Every structure is written in C-alpha cells, then in structure tokens.
Amino acid sequence: MPVQPCSLPAGFLPAAVSLPSQQTVIAEDETGKATIYHDAPLPIPEPHMVLVKTIAVSINPCDWKMPSRFPAPGARIGCDFAGIVLSIGPEAARIRRDLRIGDRVCGGIHGSNPIDLPSGSFSQYVAAHADLLLKLPNKLSFAQGAVLGGSVFATLWIALYESLGLEGTPDMPLQDDPPPVLVYGGSTSTGTAALQILRLSGYRPIATCSPHNNDLVRAAGAEKVFDYRSETCAADIKSYTNGRLRHVLDIITDLQSQLICYDTFSRVGGKYTCLEQPAEELHLRRTVRKEMIVGLAASGKEIALADGYERTANPQLRARSGEFFQTIQRLVDEGKFVPHPTRTVEGGFEGILKCLDILKSGGTSGEKLVVFVDRENP
C-alpha cells in the first residue's frame, strides 16, 4: 500500500496527539482476502466527520460476506468500532456541539467500500460521520461500545421505520392495543437490539431463537419466544398472534427463515423485511410484501455494491437516521438500552482474522465477538 504523510484538512480542530504517517489495518488483497497491512495511510476525514483512535472493534457477518461477494482490492474491512475522538471537522463541530476531543464514542462505517477504500473499522484510526456516532457513558466499556457500534441502529432504523413502516417509536410509543412484531433471529445482536426498541416503542415483540438463548431473548423484551427448529414453529406463531401478525423482520434470511416467516402470516398477509437477498422462488404470496434493506444506506451515500445491494445516495435518509441516533443516545444515557453480550478474542489484528473465521463457521450464538486493537485503553 502507498504511504503518504498524515495531515488533517483545513478547519479541523487540532488532533489531541501527534498523528503517525502510517497505521495498521486489515484490508482486502487482490483476491478480496482479509490481509493485515502495517503501512496504510490514515483516512482523511470530510468536514462533517471526526477522526477517532480505534480502541476496540466488533465483528459482523458482513465483514466476511462483503469481501467474499463483492471483492474490492485495497478496501479496508470492518464496520463497528469504539474509540476516542482525536479531531473534529468544522461541519461536525456545528452539527454535534456536544462532541469534544477526548470523548469516548462508538459508531459504524461502510467497510469493504469499493468507492471509498480507506473506510473500514479494522484500523488504528477511523474517520466517522459525526451525526451517526454515540457517546459512551462512563458505565459502558469500550468492548460494550464496540458491540453497540452503529451499524445495528442504522439497520434497525431502515428496517423498522422506513421499511416496515412502524409508527410507534421510543420517543412516542404506542399506547393502545399494541400489535405483535416478529423478529426472526432474536438472539443475534441485531435481534436483541430490535426487541428492545420494539418494546420501548409500545409493540409486542416476539422472536425465534435456539432454546438455550431463550433467557437472553426474553430479557431483551420478547414476550414470547419460539424454537425455530420446531416443525410447528410457524403454526405456533400464527396461533399465538391470532392471525394479527402483519410485520416480520427476518435477520437471518435463509431458505428456512423465509419459509417460516411467510407461513406466520394469515391470509391477509403483511410486510416481510429482511437483511439479505431473499429467494424469489419462495415469494409465492401476493399478500406478503417483501423488501430487503441495506443498513449501510443510512449514511446517505451511494452504496456501490451489486446484485440488489446497491443503493443511490439519499441525504434525506441520512438526516432521518441521524435523528434516530439522537433517540438511541438518550436511551443509552438513561440506561434503557443494554448492549448485547460480548466475547473478547485476544490477538489484536490477528485476533480479528480469527474472528472472521469463527463467524464463517457459525461458531457464535447469543454473543458478539470483540477485539481490542489498542490494549493501552481497555
């Protein structure tokens, strides 16, 4: 990778420390394979961004899926991070007057980005959107902050409100006769976050998971939990909801999940929102409206992927997402939102590569993998 001197753009508040000219990152090689580089330049933040020193990162399925499906040689990998603010852009200072150099923050960015190669959280330094950052209260660790990240909340804003069209929010929850909402994949980090937001928004969240994760999912807010491996899973959900189920969020999105989710609807149908490309051959019910969402689109920037994952730039979506992050900040500050359980993996950047292999093999359940890239600030 080429080396270039590090210098912040004009108008940025001075960095809290002297910045190196190079950093260690994990980026895609010529074949898309995740590879450690020790000579990568620091990212150059835009005026609405802040520069963050990365302390810890969490690993998501998309961190191995995107390089595999959409190789982008040179693109840095990783989405979620927690760290310390080093410098603040002039526009960022205007829109986030609460941010200060030295603040502990967490957020998410578009890793494996073919049109913005330096964007990736598996780096010692990250340029992040100021309005999509959360400040970490003292009671939360950097590991918990990395699990909070930002990609989960970006995904859930689009899934629950832009796609499913839910009206109740944590700021204005439903008051009367709350309807059920199914979260398929309730023990994932996105699942437990969705359940908490739904409960705080006045809905009746129900979920699927493995039985050994029932307590975790109930604690997140599910009023009823169903075993997705049961042959009667869909029928049990339909019976429990008395045919009232109209909203389904499928976090897993495979053939099994799609079949079960579709069968939970009554003849009236409803809206099925998923996070991966669904199988068209299973979309046999006209009364069920399906939509795949891409959480990365919350940035408002173009998503230059393919096969249905591409999105045009949408500044209005970015503005609405930023408002939702303000709501999440309040919930975190008030202790009303609990981060997903963490599992710390040692080894720094080598540990991140190990975590990618763990996720590929399906070696996690009910926990989020976290790696510290800076052990001086645990």
UniProtKB/Swiss-Prot annotation:
Pathway involvement of the protein, from the record:
Secondary metabolite biosynthesis
Report whether Metal-binding shows up as a keyword of the record: no
Which residues are involved in binding NADP(+)? 62-65, 187-190, 210-213, 228, 275-276, 364-365
Please verify whether the record's keywords include NADP. yes
**Per its record, what are the GO molecular function terms?**
nucleotide binding; oxidoreductase activity, acting on NAD(P)H
The record ties this protein, via CDD domains, to: enoyl_reductase_like
Enzyme superclass (EC)? oxidoreductase
Instruction: State the EC number(s).
Output: 1.-.-.-
Q: Which residues bind substrate?
A: S151, V152, F153, A154, T155, L156, W157, I158, G295, L296, A297, A298, S299
UniProt induction comment: Expression is positively regulated by the oxaleimides biosynthesis cluster-specific transcription factor poxB.
Q: Which UniProt keywords apply?
A: NADP, Nucleotide-binding, Oxidoreductase
What the record says about family reads:
Belongs to the zinc-containing alcohol dehydrogenase family.
Role this protein plays = Trans-enoyl reductase; part of the gene cluster that mediates the biosynthesis of oxaleimides, cytotoxic compounds containing an unusual disubstituted succinimide moiety. The first step of the pathway is provided by the HR-PKS poxF that serves in a new mode of collaborative biosynthesis with the PKS-NRPS poxE, by providing the olefin containing amino acid substrate via the synthesis of an ACP-bound dec-4-enoate.
Q: How does it assemble?
A: Monomer.
Name recorded for this polypeptide: Trans-enoyl reductase poxP
